[in-house]
Swiss-Prot record:
Cofactor(s) demanded: Zn(2+)
Name of this chain's protein: DNA gyrase inhibitor YacG
Gene Ontology terms: biological process: regulation of DNA-templated transcription
Family: Belongs to the DNA gyrase inhibitor YacG family.
Keywords annotated in UniProt: Metal-binding, Zinc
Lineage, highest ranks first: Bacteria, Pseudomonadati, Pseudomonadota, Gammaproteobacteria, Pasteurellales
Gene: yacG
HAMAP family tied to this protein: DNA_gyrase_inhibitor_YacG (MF_00649)
Superkingdom, natural source: Bacteria
Positions annotated to bind Zn(2+): C10, C13, C29, C33
InterPro entries attached to this UniProt entry: DNA_gyrase_inhibitor_YacG (IPR005584), Znf_NHR/GATA (IPR013088)
Subunit structure: Interacts with GyrB.
Length: 68
């Protein structure tokens, strides 16, 4: 097993983050960067690409969770 520590860049600030159990916020370097990322998802600034996103706009399609 190699003795080299794996490091990844923080997705927000690009600071190097060691990939170890003690890195509480990995892949982020800090709680601040983690919350910035969460805020971007919540504000819909980030999204997972999909060709089938139109289903959410079709009122005739049931999602299985709605109460009628």
């Amino acid at each position: 097993m190699p003795d080299e520590m794996i490091e990844v860049p923080c997705p927000i600030c690009q600071k190097s983050v060691p990939w170890i159990n003690e890195s509480t916020f990995r892949p982020f370097c800090s709680k601040r960067c983690q919350l910035i990322d969460l805020g971007e998802w919540a504000a819909e600034e980030k999204a997972i690409p999909s060709d089938t996103a139109d289903f959410a706009m079709d009122p005739n399609m049931s999602d299985g969770w709605s109460i009628k």
